[in-house]
């Protein structure tokens, strides 16, 4: 009985978190969501940095951190 209750609570929490995420990030549900944003940031010139939006800077920082991470390098050896 307790395992069924835990399973139901887990299912409800997944559904609620999915709904809240979709409401907080509606662009992820749209067809024009850019999944190749990191590829676009790969070929930046110095002049391009002046045109970046804050979200682009966050992606660029995440990409740089991922490249510096030793665990990331181990995955590709």
Swiss-Prot record:
Entry GO terms, CC: extracellular region
Subcellular location: Secreted
Keyword Repressor part of the UniProt annotation: no
Tissue specificity as recorded in UniProt: Expressed by the venom gland.
Signal peptide: 1-24
Superkingdom of this protein's organism: Eukaryota
Keyword terms: Secreted, Signal
Family listed: Belongs to the non-disulfide-bridged peptide (NDBP) superfamily. Long chain multifunctional peptide (group 2) family.
Protein name: Anionic peptide 17.1
Organism: Lychas mucronatus (Chinese swimming scorpion)
């Amino acid at each position: 009985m307790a395992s069924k209750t835990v399973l139901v609570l887990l299912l409800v929490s997944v559904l609620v978190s999915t709904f809240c995420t979709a409401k907080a990030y509606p662009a992820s549900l749209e067809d024009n969501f850019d999944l190749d944003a990191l590829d676009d940031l790969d070929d930046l010139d110095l002049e391009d940095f002046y045109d970046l939006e804050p979200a682009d800077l966050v992606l660029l920082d995440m990409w740089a951190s991922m490249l510096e991470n030793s665990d990331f390098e181990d995955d590709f050896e």
